[in-house]
Amino acid sequence: MQGSVSNKISKAAAKIKNEFSQKLSVKDVARECDMSESSLYHNFKIVTSLSPIAFQKKIRLEEAKNLLATKKIGVAQAAFDVGYESASQFSREYARMFGMPPKVHSEILRSGVAS
């Protein structure tokens, strides 16, 4: 992969990481990185093995896991804090990624049994 394309993908990944709780517009990210949407999708997947949307989702869920482990907040609050508009959608995606519902996982994380 050419250096300039690699730099553009790094820039896109950094933008998504920094703004993970915001609504993601791949079109806007592509424009800011001076790429077409299709080129961004294609090259982003080569570099990260995820689409830009899946990358954002992974970051959101990891951040939610950290919030649930370290703060005394409920699942719905964690969902909204990381950018989800629906607590039920958040719970489904969280369980899919971590293998258990966020409420159960947060209790385990807070008790120090799992990391």
Segments (PLM) and residue ranges:
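Inter-domain helical "communication" segments and dimerization helices
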Residues: M1-A14, N18-Q22, R110-S115
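Basic/polar phosphate-binding segments, predominantly the helix-turn-helix DNA-binding elements
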Residues: K11, K15-K17, K23-I59, A79-V104
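Short amphipathic helical patch at the helix-1/turn junction of helix-turn-helix
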Residues: F20-S21, L68-T70
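Ser/Thr-centric signal marking residues that sit
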Residues: T48, K71, A76
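Short, basic, alpha-helical segments at the C-terminal edge of helix-turn-helix-like DNA-binding modules
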Residues: Q56-K65, V104-S115
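Intrinsically disordered, low-complexity basic tails/linkers immediately adjacent to helix-turn-helix/homeobox/MYB/SANT
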Residues: Q77, D81, G112-S115
